[in-house]
């Protein structure tokens, strides 16, 4: 069956109080997957975690698209076309939490009538 469980793990500590974990794991069937986790401290002192899983069958496409996205960021930074983080974080508070946006002009009944969309309270 192999090594089952965690095969590889790397932590990345940042100055913005975020920690990223890059984990390679093996499931019960012997398949490998990548688990990327972001952990950050919330204003209340708790930790908020966000996680994505990338499975073996998608790893090549994921790598290709991730490298393209990173190249765009690097190109934008090198040409100085990246603005202040405040502009890019619309709808987020000082600590990265979602802030309630003004939806007073939004017709909730017509948008929600299909039942597919639900109002989120942040």
UniProtKB/Swiss-Prot annotation:
Residues 77-86 have a biased composition (Polar residues). PUR repeat repeats lie at residues 3-76. Coiled coil: none annotated. Keywords: Cytoplasm, DNA-binding, Repressor, RNA-binding, Transcription, Transcription regulation, Translation regulation. One of its GO terms (molecular function) is purine-rich negative regulatory element binding. GO terms for biological process: regulation of translation. InterPro entries: PUR-bd_fam. It is found in: Cytoplasm. Disruption phenotype: Essential, it cannot be deleted. Belongs to the PUR DNA-binding protein family. A transcription and translation regulator. Binds DNA adjacent to the erp transcriptional promoter; in combination with BpbA inhibits transcription from the promoter. EbfC counteracts the effect of Bpur on BpbA. Overexpression leads to decreased amounts of ErpA protein. Binds DNA and RNA; binds preferentially to RNA (dissociation constant 13 nM), dsDNA (dissociation constant 130 nM) and least well to ssDNA (dissociation constant 390 nM). Binds to its own (RNA) transcript in vivo and in vitro but not to its (DNA) promoter; inhibits translation from its mRNA. Homodimer. This is Transcriptional/translational repressor BpuR. It comes from Borreliella burgdorferi (strain ATCC 35210 / DSM 4680 / CIP 102532 / B31).
